[in-house]
Amino acid sequence: MDSSEVVKVKQASIPAPGSILSQPNTEQSPAIVLPFQFEATTFGTAETAAQVSLQTADPITKLTAPYRHAQIVECKAILTPTDLAVSNPLTVYLAWVPANSPATPTQILRVYGGQSFVLGGAISAAKTIEVPLNLDSVNRMLKDSVTYTDTPKLLAYSRAPTNPSKIPTASIQISGRIRLSKPMLIAN
């Protein structure tokens, strides 16, 4: 088995892109597109119920701090098992939703497109799973002159393992690229 194999899984979603303020018909500020990646949560030591809003996630707010506008260009959730997952498999539930969705991590399978993944065990132990964010189902604008309530949010859940590990057996990272524009005047 190739340990570098990546399984890419699309989430079914309803096309409902967010609306944003119209751009003025004048010269625009230059923009820069930067990559980002951060660990959203870990699994395997206890029950995990995570809700990660990209608009308020600490790594994203630090990256976007010196800019007035920030827009997601691409984004994905990456489920990564560790070597401990071979002997301690676990099921992880995952769904991308708009931030204003009332769904909770324990309701993922009742959300259209919510999925479950088995991490670990003899068959899928070394496979990384990528779940891309469908940008047509959320508002891409994380930072603007107004605050949007339908920006991307990741829901993730895993029950408490039968034999909890002292260190995590899997983790989930959120990775992507973000367009930043209109620098702010800030004190150094």
UniProtKB/Swiss-Prot annotation:
- GO molecular-function terms, A-Z: structural molecule activity
**Cellular localization per UniProt:** Virion
The answer to keyword RNA-binding applying to this record is no
Entries under SUPFAM superfamilies matching the protein: Positive stranded ssRNA viruses
**Keywords attached to this entry:** Capsid protein, T=3 icosahedral capsid protein, Virion
A GO CC annotation given for this chain: T=3 icosahedral viral capsid
Q: Which residues form the signal peptide?
A: none
Broad class of the protein's primary localization = virion
Functional note? Self-assembles to form a T=3 icosahedral capsid composed of 180 copies of the capsid protein. The capsid encapsulates the single-stranded RNA genome.
Q: Which family does the entry's similarity section mention?
A: Belongs to the tymoviruses capsid protein family.
Name of the protein described by the UniProt record: Capsid protein
Look up and give the organism this protein is from. Answer: Physalis mottle virus
